[in-house]
Amino acid sequence: MLSTALSPSSPHADYNSYSSSLSPTSPRFHASSAPHGRRSPSPSRLESLLDAPLPSCRPSRSPRSRKIRDALARHIRPHLTPRTLTMLFLWMLSVWSIHHFFLPISSLSRLSNPRAEEHFLSTAFPPPPQRIGDDHLDSVDPRWRAYHPLPAPDPPFPRLRPTRFLPPQCLEQWFAEGETLCGAKELGEEEKLDATWLWVNGSDHRWRDSMIEWREKENVNSPERHFREQNELVHSMRSVLDALPGHLRTFHLILADYTFNYPEDLELVPFSIIPDLEKVASKSKGRRHPRDLPGTPPSFSNLTERVTPESISASLASHLQSEWRIVQTPTWLDFSRRDPSDPSHPFHPYSVSKAGERGQHYAEASYPTLRYASHWEVFHTPSVDRDGRQELMGEREWRENEWKKKALPTFNSMAIESRIGWLPGLADAIIALNDDFFLLRPHAVSDFHSPLYGSVIRFDHGYNQQVRPEVVKSHINDPGEIGGLYHANAILSQRFPHRLRPYFAHVPKVITRGLHHEASLMFKEALTESSTRRFREMKIGEGDVQMQWLLTSLRVERWREALLWTWVVANMGTISGSQDRWDDATRTAIKDMFGFTENDNDVVKIEVHRGERWTLEPGRMQKAFEQAGWEAPKATEFLFSSMDGTMPPLLKHGEDPAQNDRCMIDLNRCFGVFWTREEDILSTDMMKRLTFQYPECGDCMIMALVTASGTLGLNAFFPPKETTVTAPELAPGDGYPKFLPPPHLPLTPTWHEADFSLANILSTTALPGEQVDIRQYCMRLLSRYLYLDARSVSHFHMLKSAEHAQRVFKMIQDNPRVSILGMNDDIESDYDEVKRLMNEWFEMRWPRKAVWEREWDPVKDRYID
């Protein structure tokens, strides 16, 4: 079935556009070219051809052709009367109606062999639409900005998109053999990262008045230091620009916003955009305000002129009050220099050539865009069912508006973080930073994420720092993050094994939008409720949800689940040609894997030892990145790769690390009646048994299969090559899907209600009746959750006083190995002096201003080779 690709400029292309095989963004697109062996004409040759006299193109009028025309005119023309044409039209309309409504005929695309690739959304998220009004103008007042919010994403949303898959031949080599012969040509360009920041100016009187009002309404006492602003944001952004020059796509600021107060906020609307807004606000076509009539035009070139109630129509006044809002903005931000694609931007090629410069520094040629989004624009609820495909029906818009009334305004960063996946124009790979995070050394994209190894997670390996899997009532209104961590692990432990999970280091977090969307569907009830907690100190529900930690741990669990599903369901469940069943052939395969002989029928337990692995041996990773033409990591030490199975549990201090290199499989306990009574069992039941009911069995089987795969790759998990499974046929009354979610497992909030059968999984991720290469399917599934456990030299400091601040800054300056810095404002004394010391150190460390800063100097702040 051929799917069309919407143009980015289309009003419906913002969230829904996807590529067909005819789209240049599709991997199946082939551009037409000149025939082999023939050169295209040169420009001079084309010019001579155009200047040459054209040959005669008149058709030959042979006697035979004249006779045919005369016969047609003599026999057909008399019957072409209005009456016969009307009857012919009615007959065609009747035939069309019968076959369209009563006896539908399959379209040619259905009669041909449809392919799932033509229905997957593009891996790249389309750019969002422009806001109404000239959003590239600078703000009238640097503290606030009048804006028209972007609409909610078109339903169904979120639409799960594929991660960036390797090409099929590279994917096979990488997962089966642990290395690939593919180079830069096959693997493509290195990914660019997006970066996100949450920001609020706690000294803004408008924001403070709102916070005090809601604090009294909710009867809470929120610490003031959570909202103090020490000018950290601008330097945090500078540090990321300096650490990753040329490797960043978009910076996103998530900002607080307010309702539009009329007429006080009129002065924040740029005077130059009033004519365009009048057209938007006018409901009748052609209706015009008297100001726009000939003879009375004001001068709109004066950007400093203020808008007054007398200068706008009643319809525009109503439009601004009902549709527009005010967003809080950093005073140093010049909105006219946010987008390098704007010809007026200093780093746009047009501006560079106009200035007479011969070339650009690579960091300027690939300078990131800066986007902003308000809380109003990111606070939405899912409009799609948990299958990731079916649109939720009912009074959805009304329900979302009622929920927004409970959730906004919000003063809870955890609630805001849970909505990051709704940021318009967000890339798939994201660095999420607090405004007090700083990068101190050069980094590569691969220090955070890559298609080969996945996302880089920096866990805290302290056993006593692990997060408990239960809601603790005394921590529900905790002003810190403990309550949010416990709640996050509690909901994770309903869907995955119930256990302690490691905390993460206080550093920037790597998240993917695809996984954020999965979590938004899987845990939508818990996240929807927790997002209504305006303050962390509130007692609503079961507490906050620490979204960044949830996503980090979810990646680890989804990888483990996908590994076991690949072996249990896709491999062992299809080994005898049947689908979703473990039988005698499965028992034989398991015995062969463990080397059973005829005399081993009484064996009950098997001790498994972790085999030697080369995945993280010195130089191997660097070689893989060099072969791909991508930068190797610069500031990270890697401890574990998901390509070696699943991360071993943390050990108490003093315990022998070797105990994580062996395990015991109790065949009777792990396989149940399938082994003890030799009964056949559904593979989906065995999946739940090994993965969730007895998780130690699943973990030990993973160790055994990784060892069986050899020193590299995961070949023992996968079904044999050329293994295909037929997806379920189209249900009566259902139509072909307009888009397909990528390979993924159920998004249910508990494992008990999940259906892991091949039929169910393929019913939503493959076309009806499609022959699915299940081996490639599993590799694409695993690509979605790849990860590395790593550590960087990072420092985290809570500044207490001026003397403490001086010691901290000296310690950092004396240690050039520190790559990541977190610095919390916990000032107890010498507040003004600490603030001065902070800003002096910031300016000393990152003097080069970003192009979107108001005081940016085109000479002093340029990049120099």
From Swiss-Prot:
Q: Which organism is the protein's source?
A: Cryptococcus gattii serotype B (strain WM276 / ATCC MYA-4071)
What job does the chain carry out? Xylosylphosphotransferase that is specific for UDP-xylose as a donor and mannose as an acceptor to form a xylose-alpha-1-phosphate-6-mannose linkage. Functions in the O-glycosylation of proteins en route through the secretory pathway.
- List the gene name: XPT1
For activity, the cofactor(s) needed are: Mn(2+)
In which family does this protein belong, per the annotation?
Belongs to the XPT1 family.
Annotated glycan sites:
201, 302
Q: What is its EC number?
A: 2.7.8.32
Q: Which residues lie on this side of the membrane: Cytoplasmic?
A: 1-84
Q: Which reaction does it catalyse?
A: 3-alpha-D-mannopyranosyl-alpha-D-mannopyranose + UDP-alpha-D-xylose = 3-O-(6-O-alpha-D-xylosylphospho-alpha-D-mannopyranosyl)-alpha-D-mannopyranose + UMP + H(+)
Q: Which UniProt keywords apply?
A: Carbohydrate metabolism, Glycoprotein, Glycosyltransferase, Golgi apparatus, Manganese, Membrane, Transferase, Transmembrane, Transmembrane helix, Xylose metabolism
Q: Where is the composition biased (Low complexity)?
A: 17-26, 40-60
Q: Which sequence ranges are listed under topological domain Lumenal?
A: 106-865
Q: Please cite one Gene Ontology biological process associated with this protein.
A: D-xylose metabolic process
Membrane topology type: Single-pass type I membrane protein
GO MF terms listed in the record are:
glycosyltransferase activity; UDP-N-acetylglucosamine-lysosomal-enzyme N-acetylglucosaminephosphotransferase activity
* GO cellular component terms listed in the entry, alphabetical order: Golgi membrane
| Residue stretches of biased makeup (Polar residues) | 1-10
Where do transmembrane segments lie in this chain?
85-105
- The reply on keyword Glycosyltransferase is yes
Q: Where does the record place the region Disordered? A: 1-66, 283-304
> Which InterPro entries does this one have?
Stealth (IPR047141), Stealth_CR3 (IPR031357), Stealth_CR4 (IPR031356)
Report the record's disulfide bonds. none
List the protein's name: 3-O-alpha-D-mannopyranosyl-alpha-D-mannopyranose xylosylphosphotransferase
Q: Where in the cell is it found?
A: Golgi apparatus membrane
